[in-house]
Curated annotation (Swiss-Prot):
Localization per Swiss-Prot or TrEMBL: Cell membrane
pH-activity relationship: Active at pH 7.0 and below.
GO BP annotations, alphabetical order: intracellular potassium ion homeostasis; sodium ion transport
Keywords: Antiport, Cell membrane, Ion transport, Membrane, Sodium, Sodium transport, Transmembrane, Transmembrane helix, Transport
Membrane topology: Multi-pass membrane protein
Broad class of the protein's primary localization: membrane
One MF annotation (Gene Ontology) recorded for this entry: potassium:proton antiporter activity
Keyword hit for Metal-binding: no
Protein family according to the UniProt entry: Belongs to the monovalent cation:proton antiporter 1 (CPA1) transporter (TC 2.A.36) family.
Membrane-traversing stretches: 1-21, 29-49, 57-77, 95-115, 120-140, 158-178, 184-204, 208-228, 236-256, 286-306, 309-329, 382-402
Pfam families linked: Na_H_Exchanger
The protein, known as: Na(+)/H(+) antiporter 1
Keyword Lipid metabolism set for record: no
Amino acid sequence: MELMMAIGYLGLALVLGSLVAKIAEKLKIPDIPLLLLLGLIIGPFLQIIPSDSAMEIFEYAGPIGLIFILLGGAFTMRISLLKRVIKTVVRLDTITFLITLLISGFIFNMVLNLPYTSPVGYLFGAITAATDPATLIPVFSRVRTNPEVAITLEAESIFNDPLGIVSTSVILGLFGLFSSSNPLIDLITLAGGAIVVGLLLAKIYEKIIIHCDFHEYVAPLVLGGAMLLLYVGDDLLPSICGYGFSGYMAVAIMGLYLGDALFRADDIDYKYIVSFCDDLSLLARVFIFVFLGACIKLSMLENYFIPGLLVALGSIFLARPLGVFLGLIGSKHSFKEKLYFALEGPRGVVPAALAVTVGIEILKNADKIPASITKYITPTDIAGTIIIGTFMTILLSVILEASWAGMLALKLLGEYKPKYKEESHH
């Protein structure tokens, strides 16, 4: 694809995406479903942006956009508020996440008539298990509910994003697309390394930023560090020693620690970074969802719509609720609170970026996938069902769960009356 064509497509996505996002704001609905539909219209329906060109652009826009969103989301999360809900968040991001992944994978294999142990289903489960801060944060800024409930779901979504990426990488090892000698060791090095390196860079940045007033230069400094984390963890280290760390998880950890440190120090540079991240996150959302819609070919929709719809419904109404109820057994939460958590897990940016990235990888490296997998399903069908299944999961979960968030909060949790002026969680 020519450079000027790519610039034209990006410009078109931004102009139309901004108009659509403004309409969504006026209608008081999340912009994600409208951006996805816009992508479908200018992609497969009107053929303005060819599917292959959309995929090419996504290879760059997806990973860079994820950095913006994870950094911005973690940067505004307060550790003091996180401490209040940490037990629930840890359960949701471990037990609930894993159960949701496994049940979604099981349903996927059942719908597509694959062996129950086939890694194809569990790859879909890993891609779609992460919930979405880009949907939840705007929803809870409008819905009056107990701040602890809102913070729990927002924190869960910020930290399960990198977990979704890590678990997808580990399962890709079974496809021969991610060098993996031992999935368990990979998981430990990817997550553990990310925490150590993310904290280390955050500490270095904290010292530099507090002692030198960077002002408008602070945002590129922090963003550049986040991009280098991704490069070092996901590319440089694995090529040198065979083991890396999850760059995305390191970005989230760095954002959380640095944002909190600068906020508590009342450092002027904090505001520069927040407004910069907000602007970039908006750009990333427009690119990721418009190009996800545009990536889809009409033939894909025709072939995979029914299985895609079934696995999406299974993921939203079976996998997530079972994951929440099993994950929170014996916790302090009432049945109604658990039900609210179960029905508020919209999927968004990370599943969108992962589905297309994984789809591209599978199609590019079809010859590397083991025969034990391809004798039941072709690489083209793997990529198609995962992309359409994820698309349907995002579309349905965001439309339904953002629409009923306020009504369910009122029905299940009752009207929230603050006892005193709550400290903002943003």
